[in-house]
């Protein structure tokens, strides 16, 4: 008699005595609700129909040589699961109050949106890097040109270091501006730019201040001049109220484009040439804004 599909068959040629097994007479075979038949022989083979399990050999035991039938509980055969299956079933049951599930978005639209976001971030980052590199290159070029404008490269470098030390010691350009020039209480310093002013004696290093009321320039160091037979020293200063501004003209040398200038013209046609800016573009923008502000005041 062939056992039903899915049942377990055990065969052995050595009789086994096991008190835990329920022994029944062969006449009652088929009457009991048994799903498993064990034939006692010398070698035990356990095979499960419908599975890929390899037959397992059990150790032989000595006993009488009679054939006996043994009944197993159906729950012991069909009720067990593999550990992974148990974990999966308990997880899917939702009995753990600390576990939550949300569906993963795997649609093409979601993937496309993610890629577009990444492209946008990388694009903005690339533009910022390019702008920073351009500004760094411009600053390096302006610094080199600033130092070259002076009659002595070494003197220009030392003068710039001395000016920076002075600004730090005095507490910033705002205090130096108010100490150097007459100002109104409501007047505000908007910007300051290290540069040179072209004079009959050559380029003079100094700082151009742009306030809410005027343009003001002062040399970093005092200049010598003759007063009769005596030599005197004084700082070179230029002050132009905003309402007296007529034009601001940026330009560059045809021979050497790195040499950039800003021409400032007053309403009474006095011209002032500034050059060697560390921040040329910023100076042009600030001066043009001041020109517009002065034009509005004069109306």
UniProtKB/Swiss-Prot annotation:
Domain of life: Eukaryota
Pfam family, one: GRAM
Gene3D superfamilies: Pleckstrin-homology domain (PH domain)/Phosphotyrosine-binding domain (PTB)
Bias (Polar residues): 78-95
GO cellular component, one term: vacuole
GRAM domain segment(s): 175-252
Comp. bias regions, Basic and acidic residues: 1-16
Annotated segments matching region Disordered: 1-112
GO biological process, one term: regulation of epidermal cell division
InterPro entries: GEM-like, GRAM, PH-like_dom_sf
Distribution of this protein across tissues and organs: Ubiquitous.
Functional summary from the UniProt entry: Involved in the spatial control of cell division, patterning and differentiation of Arabidopsis root epidermal cells. Could be part of a complex that negatively modulates GLABRA2 and CAPRICE expression via the maintenance of a repressor histone H3 epigenetics status of the GL2 and CPC promoters.
Assembly, per entry: Interacts with CDT1, a DNA replication protein and TTG1 (TRANSPARENT TESTA GLABRA1), a WD40-repeat protein involved in GLABRA2-dependent cell fate decision.
Protein family per UniProt: Belongs to the GEM family.
Designated name of the protein: GLABRA2 expression modulator
Designated gene of the protein: GEM
